[in-house]
């Protein structure tokens, strides 16, 4: 299974650019749990994401949602969804209201997002990947994911909001590996991105 996670930023200048630590933690935890059963590729550049997408189609795309990258995520998500409507796209990040009315409004206007992961997403993303891995390849679709309830996530299915905000916290922070110690941030550090610790 191939997964693309993107924490997109404008990359005209490498001024004040930070490593994609959030998606790094999602990846580090799921890599720890799945080993080589899932391959991850991380992106900061929208151009690199879309160029890679054109060469090799993933099984899942995940986008971050911050005030500074809303437009980039929308551009990339809409581009991918237009070309492959059945490809599941998930999103997470703090740039969303946390009440169900606000979540529903967001998902209805952001049609390229199939599932939104609320709060810290390490466990939710792991559960999504586990669900998709347990499906036959032809049932790893956007519609199948929208119909699946994952704790801490919301979707629009059959024209209604489904899901919950039941976020699971780790009992021990050491349960989630560091994306820096696992080497996931090395390519970004080599490109001159600043670490967020």
Where are the regions that the model predicts?
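Glycine-rich beta-alpha loop elements in corrinoid/cobalamin-binding modules
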Residues: 29, 37-170
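Beta-sheet entry/capping signal
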Residues: 2-3, 88, 114-115, 193-196
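Glycine/Thr-rich phosphate-binding loops of Rossmann-like dinucleotide-binding domains
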Residues: 13-14, 71, 126, 186
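Glycine- and acidic-residue-enriched helix-capping/strand-helix junction motifs
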Residues: 12-23
